[in-house]
């Protein structure tokens, strides 16, 4: 489950200066003038494995796209024209890898701030020879606002975002009305927004916020069944076995 908390390498053999510079935008890039938002992640030190460190060092240039405050040329980034799916907060990338492999006709752009998660997915991409997946390591709000052209996405996945369970922290939840409106504007007509959470009160908020966006319509009467393309994670399977709930929401651009 993604916590949207960027990890920092522990003390030891440092990443190269070039790699550090490539990673820095995920933590230090300023907002565009006059455009500010409450970030849905916090800066804390975290563990990163040697394999993840090696992937960051060796594979960022091959499979990642640097943040830039201008629309991304998807055809150039992927080397082909294909429907593009944006995934926000892919955690360690297990689900992202499986979906990209199962849907070779689509392009997938994953956005994450964790060094450990980015390193993990880079390794998965290389190991599984996934050609239809790219990564942007940067704040998701800025990526959507600055790099995604209006009416351009075939779909958006937001799976298990940080629930920020304390009431005073709910303002940090990713899926707030302004961001949902921004996501909806980036979807092509007929494009979908698929969210999943295992926190019931966040599911209630998601349903309210998505249902209040004029550009979106619910494809179900309330919550949706888990679509076949979203694999059930080990964490999710264990939670369901213990009686915990998982709520999927599927909305489409009108």
UniProtKB/Swiss-Prot annotation:
Keyword tRNA processing part of the UniProt annotation: yes
Amino acids binding substrate: 166, 198, 233-236
Major enzyme class: transferase
Entry GO MF terms: tRNA (guanine(46)-N7)-methyltransferase activity
Binding site for S-adenosyl-L-methionine: 87, 112, 139, 162
Keywords: Methyltransferase, S-adenosyl-L-methionine, Transferase, tRNA processing
InterPro entries: SAM-dependent_MTases_sf, tRNA_(Gua-N-7)_MeTrfase_Trmb, tRNA_methyltr_TrmB_bact
Enzyme Commission designation: 2.1.1.33
Recorded metabolic or biological pathway in which this protein acts: tRNA modification; N(7)-methylguanine-tRNA biosynthesis
Positions of the catalytic residues: 162
Enzymatic reactions: guanosine(46) in tRNA + S-adenosyl-L-methionine = N(7)-methylguanosine(46) in tRNA + S-adenosyl-L-homocysteine
Lineage top rank: taxon: Bacteria
Region (Disordered): 1-34
Keyword Lipid biosynthesis: no
GO cellular-component term (any): tRNA methyltransferase complex
Family designation: Belongs to the class I-like SAM-binding methyltransferase superfamily. TrmB family.
Function per UniProt: Catalyzes the formation of N(7)-methylguanine at position 46 (m7G46) in tRNA.
Protein name from the UniProt record: tRNA (guanine-N(7)-)-methyltransferase
């Amino acid at each position: 489950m993604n916590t949207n908390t960027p990890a920092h390498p522990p003390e030891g053999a440092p990443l190269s200066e070039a790699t550090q510079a490539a990673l820095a935008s995920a933590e230090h890039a300023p907002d565009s003038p006059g455009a500010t938002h409450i970030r849905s992640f916090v800066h804390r030190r975290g563990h990163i494995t040697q394999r993840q460190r090696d992937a960051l060092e060796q594979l960022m240039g091959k499979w990642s796209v640097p943040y830039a405050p201008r629309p991304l040329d998807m055809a150039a980034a992927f080397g082909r024209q294909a429907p593009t799916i944006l995934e926000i907060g892919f955690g360690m990338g297990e689900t992202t890898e499986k979906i990209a492999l199962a849907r070779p006709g689509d392009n997938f752009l994953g956005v994450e701030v964790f060094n450990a998660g980015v390193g993990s997915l880079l390794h998965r991409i290389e190991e599984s020879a996934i050609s239809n997946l790219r990564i942007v390591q940067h704040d998701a709000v800025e990526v959507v606002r600055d790099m995604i052209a209006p009416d351009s996405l075939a779909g958006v996945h937001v799976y298990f975002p940080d629930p920020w369970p304390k009431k005073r922290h709910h303002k940090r939840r990713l899926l707030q009305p302004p961001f949902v409106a921004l996501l909806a504007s980036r979807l092509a007509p007929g494009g979908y927004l698929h969210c999943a959470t295992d926190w019931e009160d966040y599911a209630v908020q998601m349903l309210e916020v998505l249902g209040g966006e004029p550009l979106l319509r619910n494809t179900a009467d309330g919550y949706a069944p888990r679509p076949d393309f979203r694999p059930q994670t080990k964490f999710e399977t264990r939670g369901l076995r213990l009686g915990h709930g998982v709520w999927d929401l599927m909305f489409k651009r009108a």
